Amino acid sequence: SKCGFSDCGDFTGSAKDILPGGQYNDRFLAYIDMIAEYAHRLQEHNIPVIFRPFHENNGSWFWWGGEHMSEQDSIKLYQYLVEQLQERNVHNFLYVYSPNGPFNSEKDYMARYPGDKYVDILAIDSYDFYYDYPATYSDNFFKNMQKSCEIIHNVAIKHDKLAAISETGCGVMKPDKSNYGG
């Protein structure tokens, strides 16, 4: 059956299932092997990859985030993935840490940060959603984005990383007040 981002079931324990000793670890490693194989083909042609695993890991709309996974398990999972790719000699990836914004503090932003040796770019994913039609403009999104970008910029300087906006956009209601349209 089809499901959306957040209505596909209970994913609690997913990290433990795919980390070493978990029932799906072999399957996870097989996926990592596929990623590494493709990365090597790109590497042969000196093509870098900006890799953003487990993005928006502070939200609950993916199995790897929010209420489905503790902060510690989220960190372990990210670290494990990077370590496995490095063990497979993948050296053309720039790794991006990109939780969903907005953020109120550096502590808020860094809650699931896997550590400097696992990340090259510090980023944010953040969207502006309008829940009415026609949309009523508000500058709150831009104020929140500015504050979040300042936080990320400051963290990036402290950790000698690049700062970026990795995903953003605007969602508006359709005239029939159904799902978001672009």
Predicted regions and their residues:
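Short linear motifs at secondary-structure transitions and domain/linker junctions
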Residues: N25-D26, E71-D73, V96-G101, Y137-F141
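A Trp-anchored, charged/polar loop motif used as the substrate-binding/catalytic surface
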Residues: D26-Y38, S98-D108, M145-S148
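Short, glycine/charged-enriched secondary-structure capping and boundary segments
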Residues: G65-G66, S138, S178-Y180
